[in-house]
């Protein structure tokens, strides 16, 4: 059996995940990070994306928003605004959010409006990707 470490995924509203895992893969601002037991200590900012969790030889994905990953000797903690399993994602709501963001992007007047619309679109596309298993 592969060596494991404790993975915690925490949002402002709940502890989304807390268990022993073999590996976690997250998207940092510098690219994908594969974290395993005895990984070097670090803190890194995360982009909107998926977290892939390997437990008992099987991978499971969840959608996460921006945040941070903290790798310590005893655990790894992901702190993010939101985290959702595929079955928790309301696909219709995500589709509507995507459409709203696309409309806001095409009609945006200022830089801040455009940036907000881009972030909203990334979140919606990420949620849809995880919900659809892509």
Curated annotation (Swiss-Prot):
Q: PANTHER family, alphabetically?
A: ATP SYNTHASE DELTA/EPSILON CHAIN, ATP SYNTHASE EPSILON CHAIN, CHLOROPLASTIC
Descriptive protein name: ATP synthase epsilon chain
Gene Ontology CC annotations of this record: plasma membrane; proton-transporting ATP synthase complex
Q: How does it assemble?
A: F-type ATPases have 2 components, CF(1) - the catalytic core - and CF(0) - the membrane proton channel. CF(1) has five subunits: alpha(3), beta(3), gamma(1), delta(1), epsilon(1). CF(0) has three main subunits: a, b and c.
One GO term in the molecular function aspect is:
ATP binding
Lineage at the top is:
Bacteria, Bacillati, Bacillota, Clostridia, Peptostreptococcales
Q: Which InterPro entries match?
A: ATP_F1_dsu/esu_C_sf, ATP_synth_F1_dsu/esu, ATP_synth_F1_dsu/esu_N, ATP_synth_F1_esu_C, ATPsynth_dsu/esu_N
What family, per the record? Belongs to the ATPase epsilon chain family.
Its biological purpose is as follows: Produces ATP from ADP in the presence of a proton gradient across the membrane.
Task: Tell me which domain of life the UniProt entry assigns to the organism this sequence originates from.
Answer: Bacteria
| Organism the protein comes from | Alkaliphilus oremlandii (strain OhILAs)
UniProt-annotated location(s) = Cell membrane
**Pfam families linked to this entry:** ATP-synt_DE (PF00401), ATP-synt_DE_N (PF02823)
Topology versus the membrane: Peripheral membrane protein
> What are the entry keywords?
ATP synthesis, Cell membrane, CF(1), Hydrogen ion transport, Ion transport, Membrane, Transport
């Amino acid at each position: 059996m592969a060596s494991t470490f404790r993975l915690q995924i925490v949002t402002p509203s709940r502890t989304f995940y807390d268990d022993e895992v073999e590996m976690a893969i997250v998207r940092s601002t510098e690219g994908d990070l594969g974290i395993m037991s005895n990984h070097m200590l670090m803190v890194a900012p995360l982009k909107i994306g998926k977290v892939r969790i390997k437990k008992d030889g099987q991978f499971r994905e969840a959608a996460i928003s921006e945040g941070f990953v903290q790798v310590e000797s005893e655990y790894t903690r992901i702190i993010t605004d939101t985290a959702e399993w595929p079955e928790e994602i309301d696909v219709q709501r995500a589709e509507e959010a995507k459409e709203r963001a696309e409309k806001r992007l095409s009609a945006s007047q200022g830089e801040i409006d455009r940036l907000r619309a881009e972030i909203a679109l990334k979140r919606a596309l990420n949620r849809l990707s995880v919900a659809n298993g892509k």
